[in-house]
Structure formats: C-alpha cells, structure tokens
Amino acid sequence: MAAAKDSHEDHDTSTENADESNHDPQFEPIVSLPEQEIKTLEEDEEELFKMRAKLFRFASENDLPEWKERGTGDVKLLKHKEKGTIRLLMRRDKTLKICANHYITPMMELKPNAGSDRAWVWNTHADFADECPKPELLAIRFLNAENAQKFKTKFEECRKEIEEREKKGPGKNDNAEKVAEKLEALSVREAREEAEEKSEEKQ
C-alpha cells in the first residue's frame, strides 16, 4: 500500500511538473504607444569636436562664492550647416541633461585654471543650460594635458573662424533678404509712378 501511495504521489508530481513546463504566459501591452522621434537640434549641425570632460560653474551668487560641479559627459563643438554659427554643447552622462550650451564668440578666451595643464576657464555672456540665457564663468577639466590641449586648439580654430566670418559682414541669407527688400521697394515705387502717370493723362 505504501508503495502504491508513493507511486501515486510521484504521478501527481510529474503531472504538476508537466503542467508547469507547458505553461507559457504571453503578456501583451494594454496600450501600444507609437515610437516618437526625438530631436536634439543637433541634426542640422556638424560635429567638429567631441571629448569626455567634467564641467564646473562659478557660483558667485552664494554667500561664499565657489566652484560647483555641473556634470561629467561629452563636450562638443557644433557648427550649424546653414548659419555657420558654432556652439559649445555638453550633456551629462545617463540623464543627457544639458550642462553647457552657448555660442562661440570672438571675445572668448580660454585661460588655465589655477595653473593646471588639463583645465581651462572662460566667460560666456549667454549660456542656455538652464533655458534662460545668463552670463557664466565656466571651467572644464579633461583626463590629461593632451586632451585639454586638443580642446583648446579646436576652440581657438572655431573662435577665429567666427571672427573672420564677422569681419566679412553679413552672410548669404542676410544679403538675399536685403536684395528682396530692395526689389520690393522698387516695385512699390514703380507702381506709384505708373499710377501718377495715368492720373496726369486723365487730367
């Protein structure tokens, strides 16, 4: 009897195992969401430089002004394909939150930070990291002196390019707009003169 009972229990157990092995639940999402295309505004820009670094800002608004870390990530120099403007953009790792976003201008100058050969300090009159533009004193630190020098070299190239571009005056788009304005003014003047001539003929 004991043997029969054991064999019955074994049979039940094997049946349960069979049921578990055959159980293959399929979970379907209740609501299917379409994929959203995420735009970073970098699609219209050419990447001139990219390197990992750590960024700081000088918190002068504090009672005791000090350097505060803004984040670690890739710093980029991006040139707009149509406008020709160049900006510095840096996002934090993982969160991708912007910690620096400003245009390169001819007046910007990189200076060594406390004599370090792998860090630079500079001023910007309008940093858009917090969406609202505001002046900032920023510092950036690289892994080594070689990387820091590569950044400085490319930064200076961009600064000089913007300086030369401003010396040449307005770009093609600006000139095209001015030509269109002149043509419009000319058309208005011609129409006015034609109306005056017709008025004189009637008299």
From Swiss-Prot:
Compositional bias (Acidic residues):
193-203
Q: Which residues carry this modification: N6-succinyllysine?
A: K150
GO MF annotations in UniProt: GTPase activator activity
Task: Give yes or no: UniProt keyword Phosphoprotein.
Answer: yes
Q: Which residues carry this modification: N-acetylalanine?
A: A2
Which InterPro entries did the record assign?
PH-like_dom_sf (IPR011993), Ran_bind_dom (IPR000156), RanBP1-like (IPR045255), RanBP1_RanBD (IPR045256)
Where does the record place Basic and acidic residues bias?
A: 1-26, 163-192
- Point out residues bearing the modification Phosphoserine: S21, S60, S187
Q: What GO terms describe the biological role, i.e. biological process, of this protein? A: nucleocytoplasmic transport; positive regulation of mitotic centrosome separation; spindle organization
Listed GO cellular component terms?
centrosome; cytoplasm; cytosol
Q: Region Disordered: start and end of each range?
A: 1-33, 163-203
Q: Which residues carry this modification: N6-acetyllysine?
A: K150, K182
- From the record, give the cysteines joined by S-S bonds: none
What are the UniProt keywords, alphabetically? Answer: Acetylation, GTPase activation, Phosphoprotein
Please give the Pfam families that the UniProt record associates with this protein. Answer: Ran_BP1
Record flagged with keyword Acetylation:
yes
**Location of the RanBD1 domain:** 26-164
Miscellaneous notes for this chain? Htf9a (RanBP1) and Htf9c are transcribed with opposite polarity from complementary DNA strands from a shared bidirectional TATA-less promoter.
The record's similarity note reads: Belongs to the RANBP1 family.
Per UniProt, subunit arrangement is:
Interacts with RAN (via C-terminus of GTP-bound form) but not with GDP-bound RAN. Identified in a complex composed of RAN, RANGAP1 and RANBP1. Identified in a complex that contains TNPO1, RAN and RANBP1. Identified in a complex that contains CSE1L, KPNA2, RAN and RANBP1. Identified in a complex with nucleotide-free RAN and RCC1.
* Functional summary from the UniProt entry: Plays a role in RAN-dependent nucleocytoplasmic transport. Alleviates the TNPO1-dependent inhibition of RAN GTPase activity and mediates the dissociation of RAN from proteins involved in transport into the nucleus. Induces a conformation change in the complex formed by XPO1 and RAN that triggers the release of the nuclear export signal of cargo proteins. Promotes the disassembly of the complex formed by RAN and importin beta. Promotes dissociation of RAN from a complex with KPNA2 and CSE1L. Required for normal mitotic spindle assembly and normal progress through mitosis via its effect on RAN.
What this protein is called in its record is Ran-specific GTPase-activating protein
